[in-house]
Curated annotation (Swiss-Prot):
Organism: Streptomyces scabiei (strain 87.22)
SUPFAM superfamilies: Nucleotidylyl transferase
Binding site for Zn(2+): 43, 228, 253
Descriptive protein name: L-cysteine:1D-myo-inositol 2-amino-2-deoxy-alpha-D-glucopyranoside ligase
GO BP: cysteinyl-tRNA aminoacylation; mycothiol biosynthetic process
Name of the gene encoding the protein in the UniProt record: mshC
Keywords: ATP-binding, Ligase, Metal-binding, Nucleotide-binding, Zinc
EC nos: 6.3.1.13
Upper lineage: Bacteria, Bacillati, Actinomycetota, Actinomycetes, Kitasatosporales
């Protein structure tokens, strides 16, 4: 599976700061020092509907992570998956009387278009769950052989009790885990499981649903969590720098993934930092495909909204914050974009070197994009009020905003 084209990232003079970022597992800021190649895995979409603002906010957060690392002159090895076979996808395809493969391909193509328009840097490896199945099957077989997994009526489940570190990623109590498991794709009430929280590793073939050869497992398809583990271990190995996604992935997805990896390798954690973006709401409720309360990136683009304004609307909120999408949020972003473009369109302006350092410092401190935007606002206001004589300043600002914030002026 291919990703989307990359936009060129300007190289800024000097060197950026090392990233200090909030780690869910420790509930605190940690400083990441990846070495010459930073490794990041971000959980991708289930392609049964278009990219909404909640998706965009999540991928914007981890695009900033990449940009901070690139500014420190590191290479970035970024991997993202696509859950291109899953119950919601199959259910939507059946509802709309469309082939599930065609639906997945259509929505994945639209996602690529949205990411390109928003100038999100693409992953080096963009891997679908289906294409990863040949690598998933041996992992499930290993877990069975080690006793970390068991069979139940043809299905294979992971035993959370096989992981002595289970629970350390999300830091939730058992009752909350059980509640969230039921809400987020688990089956805690299924009879015969050793522990209600045990997640499925391999689903035996169901009539009328797609299935693949699972070797000794029989025909079926993989569970959600083992898909990401297989892809991450194959392309990044253990101990990569960041595993990212929305805050609703901390449990069960990232918790279970860490447990699978621990049982397979004997190492913990799978990622040095578990980083989670906040939720975006509309009319008081979290944007959700199941609820249908969505604002789509593609719809805004069709309505003529500049993608740079959409990106600024996302950047106006700290990545970990929960916030609400409103018409005013978008209008504020449109107005800000206009002010910034007017400011950099002049032939000269106030000195900008200090501004570049302010943006760098803001982003290095847990991706504080609102602080970075405020710094650019101050420079733009100064430009409007009294201008300046530095002939290179507007270009410096334009390149810094492009390189660090992903906004083309």
């Amino acid at each position: 599976m291919h990703a989307w084209p990359a936009s060129e990232v300007p190289v800024l003079p000097g060197k950026g700061r090392d990233l200090r970022i909030h780690d869910t597992a420790t509930d605190g800021l940690i400083t990441l020092d990846p070495g010459p190649v930073a490794r990041i895995y971000v959980c991708g979409i289930t392609p049964y509907d278009a990219t909404h603002m909640g998706h965009a906010a999540t991928y914007n957060a981890f695009d900033l992570v990449q940009r901070v690392w690139l500014d420190t002159k590191r290479q970035v090895h970024y991997v993202q998956n696509v859950t291109d076979v899953d119950d919601p996808l199959l259910e939507r395809a059946a509802r709309d009387d469309i082939d599930w493969v065609a639906l997945a391909e259509k929505e994945t193509a639209l996602f690529r278009e949205d990411m390109t328009a928003l100038r999100m840097l693409p992953p080096r490896h963009y891997i679908g769950a289906v294409e990863a199945i040949p690598g998933i099957v041996p992992l499930v077989e290993r877990l069975l052989a080690s006793g970390a997994a068991y069979e139940l009526e043809g299905d294979v489940y992971f035993s959370v009790e096989a992981d002595p570190d289970f629970g350390k990623v999300s830091r939730l109590d058992a009752a909350t885990m059980r509640l969230l498991s039921a809400e987020r794709g688990g089956d805690p009430d299924r009879a015969g499981k050793k522990n209600p929280l045990d997640p499925m590793l391999w689903m035996a073939a169901r009539e009328g649903e797609p299935s693949w050869d699972g070797g000794s497992l029989g025909r079926g398809r993989p569970g959600w969590h083992i898909e990401c583990v297989a892809i991450a271990l194959d392309h990044l190995g253990m101990g990569f720098d960041v595993q990212g996604g929305g805050s609703d992935l901390a449990f069960p997805h990232h918790e279970m993934g860490a447990s699978h990896a621990q049982a397979l390798t004997g190492e913990f954690p799978m990622a040095k930092a578990y980083v989670h973006a906040g939720m975006v709401a509309l009319h008081g409720e979290k944007m959700s495909k199941s609820k249908g309360n969505l604002v789509f990136v593609s719809a805004l683009r069709r309505d003529g909204v500049d993608p740079a304004a959409i990106r600024l609307a996302l950047l106006a909120h700290h990545y970990r914050a929960d916030w609400e999408w409103t018409d005013q949020v978008l209008q504020d972003a449109v107005d800000r974009l206009g002010r910034w473009r007017a400011a950099v369109s002049r032939p000269d302006g106030p000195p900008a070197e200090a501004l570049v350092e302010e943006i760098r410092e803001a982003l290095a401190h847990d991706l504080d994009a609102p602080a970075a935007l405020a710094a650019v606002d101050r420079w733009a206001a100064l430009q409007e009020e009294r201008g300046g004589t530095d002939e290179g300043a507007p270009g410096v600002v334009s390149r810094a905003v492009d390189a660090l914030l992903g906004v083309a002026l």
